[in-house]
Amino acid sequence: MSQSLRIIFAGTPDFAARHLDALLSSEHQVVGVFTQPDRPAGRGKKLMPSPVKVLAEAHNLPVFQPSSLRPQDNQRLVADLGADIMVVVAYGLILPKAVLEMPRLGCINVHGSLLPRWRGAAPIQRSLWAGDSETGVTIMQMDVGLDTGDMLYKLSCPITAEDTSGSLYDKLAELGPQGLLATLAQLANGTARPEVQDESLVCHAEKLSKEEARIDWSLSAAQLERCIRAFNPWPMSWLEIDGQPVKVWRASVIAEAAHAEPGTIVAATKQGIQVATGDGILSLESLQPAGKKAMSAQDLLNSRREWFIPGTRLA
């Protein structure tokens, strides 16, 4: 068993809560938890705590919710806990240099990619969209840059042809805690071997936008099929029909020449609505009109066949 460490945990969403849960079941002592302030959510816009806050309070841990760690008073909250290390997982706030240097072993971060590939806010979605064959998690020593610190530990997993960002998120949420506990053991025992990132291999995973999720029919069918999986469950790929946004949950590639302008419906069957793209045909198999639940192409054709007349050009 490795030496027990005094840990500050900083994180916000469910992905982070799964890492906190692993720490709470370990030999280490979580001395305080930092998470984002409660946010309005739902139709009533009621203030809701983060998943990390809910878990921390269930274990009677001290919870801190500053909107920034730049003020010295907020930095003092970190210093006063006397931690050996700070573990950061999808926290959402920038840690100033002073905070990074406060714990004896500094601050480490669990990142959802195999660095230096996909530094940034949306590594899971970008790796899927790019057609990567594998991804994973990297535990790194944090510095003042964006995901630029030395790498301490990596675990990888394959990306399958069926993966969505939702399924990949779940895979990495299983790998992350394993890698985190292994890294903490190495740091506690003095056996960690930091590895500098190769700057020649860097690529960036910019934050996603809803407008970016609008289907661009000039892309190839293969690119669009990956995009649909990458943007599921958020922000969801979408197209516009009759002035209404329609989300696309699932599609497949038909490797045939379309012989039509990109965006043209070439066939509408119960198996899927076939649309010409920049290269090949994309078959839309599960769609969700505004205000409705997701449904099969067959069910949508039964109610809205006029939307999908072959020869119609989608925006």
Swiss-Prot record:
Cysteine disulfide links: none
| Official protein name in the record | Methionyl-tRNA formyltransferase
Asked if the keyword Nucleotidyltransferase belongs to this entry, the reply reads no
Question: Is the NADP keyword given for this protein?
Answer: no
Q: Name one GO molecular function term.
A: methionyl-tRNA formyltransferase activity
Give the keywords, sorted.
Protein biosynthesis, Transferase
Top-rank lineage group of the source organism: Bacteria
Q: Which GO terms describe its cellular component?
A: cytosol
Pfam families linked to this entry: Formyl_trans_C, Formyl_trans_N
* Role of this protein: Attaches a formyl group to the free amino group of methionyl-tRNA(fMet). The formyl group appears to play a dual role in the initiator identity of N-formylmethionyl-tRNA by promoting its recognition by IF2 and preventing the misappropriation of this tRNA by the elongation apparatus.
Where exactly are the transmembrane stretches of this chain? none
Instruction: Supply the gene name.
Output: fmt
